[in-house]
């Protein structure tokens, strides 16, 4: 049988022959992860099911990234509980403090996930690792507890939608614009329990960071996973992260897709997702006179070094509007240090940005950038549901780094090509 990317990877991790979408299979997992919000729930379930040890102390990752640095007593208690569990179980990959980053940027950087892996996490944006050619998906904390104990879980093999992007990317149009365009076309439930498989010349041209940006938001269309073929760029990235033994692979010729979509990127312009759903997508040029009080550049979607370079290029020699607070959150300590070496941190500070630690913070309305009634933000994050970043009476627009940075300068949502 000719396999899609999702089927091909799952087949490597099960002893059952995968013959069709919809089939139920048990798969061995390569990595299991949870964070400071979801790990305590998983630990409770782990105890309740009578588990005594994690299946492999080197293949469980616990990353304290959402409410950290601990924003209040409850957050501190959550982290303490998880820390004690990690020590009890001898978990190798426990991250808190100076070595901690946003989980979906940190794990690829450390070489803990890669091509052909099956990764499950108690976080919906676990699908990020599809940018590396992994079948990666979010599960509930109870299922993650089971995976931590057993080293396996069950899946219904998802049908696959193939999205082909052709042409050459124009200036200021990047991976975020591509994925928002796709979500705008099919809706927030357009890929419900489907794998999204990305290909085409424009996809091949993206760097691995851009691919992770797109895979990250597969869930915003309801996707079970977002997948890219593993190619030479993937292998170079993974080798630099310390991985060995990875190999390139792609979907089989003749694989069956439930649906095929095609987008020509050549004439694209920057886009934004308007409140209050990621599929409410419009060209920036059509969003007129929309003022913003906050800009957030960071997150598991767009907090990597390439994103910071893109934002800094727009901000260099310019000042953030006095009516705007622009918050820049490099996604890992490694990215922070690289940005420091390249002078990007200086650029952000000179422009008047607030540069903070690696945290999910404002993305989920947790801390370090909460919106008041009537306030509006543009952010490089992944969700703009009502009340997502604070007050139910606030609004969030989603964009790529260049558009966010340009909007910080003008105080209104701005196409960076017009500066």
From Swiss-Prot:
Gene3D superfamilies linked: Aconitase, domain 3
Origin superkingdom: Bacteria
Pathway assigned to this chain's UniProt record: Amino-acid biosynthesis; L-leucine biosynthesis; L-leucine from 3-methyl-2-oxobutanoate: step 2/4
Reported cofactor(s): [4Fe-4S] cluster
Catalysis: reaction(s): (2R,3S)-3-isopropylmalate = (2S)-2-isopropylmalate
GO MF entries: 3-isopropylmalate dehydratase activity; 4 iron, 4 sulfur cluster binding; metal ion binding
Record bears the keyword RNA-binding: no
A Gene Ontology biological process term: L-leucine biosynthetic process
Pfam annotation, one family: Aconitase
InterPro entries: Acnase/IPM_dHydase_lsu_aba_1/3 (IPR015931), Acoase/IPM_deHydtase_lsu_aba (IPR001030), Aconitase_4Fe-4S_BS (IPR018136), Aconitase_4Fe-4S_dom (IPR036008), HAcnase/IPMdehydase_lsu_prok (IPR011826), Homoacnase/IPMdehydase_lsu (IPR006251), IPM_dehydratase_rel_enz (IPR050067), IPMI_cat (IPR033941)
SUPFAM superfamilies, per the entry: Aconitase iron-sulfur domain
Cofactor: record remark: Binds 1 [4Fe-4S] cluster per subunit.
EC number(s) given by UniProt: 4.2.1.33
Key word Transcription regulation present: no
Cysteines paired by S-S bonds: none
CDD domains to which the protein is assigned, alphabetical: IPMI (cd01583)
UniProt keyword list: 4Fe-4S, Amino-acid biosynthesis, Branched-chain amino acid biosynthesis, Iron, Iron-sulfur, Leucine biosynthesis, Lyase, Metal-binding
Binding site for [4Fe-4S] cluster: 300, 360, 363
Primary role: Catalyzes the isomerization between 2-isopropylmalate and 3-isopropylmalate, via the formation of 2-isopropylmaleate.
Protein family: Belongs to the aconitase/IPM isomerase family. LeuC type 2 subfamily.
Subunit composition and interactions: Heterodimer of LeuC and LeuD.
Name of the protein this chain belongs to: 3-isopropylmalate dehydratase large subunit
Organism encoding this protein: Nitratidesulfovibrio vulgaris (strain DP4)
Gene: leuC
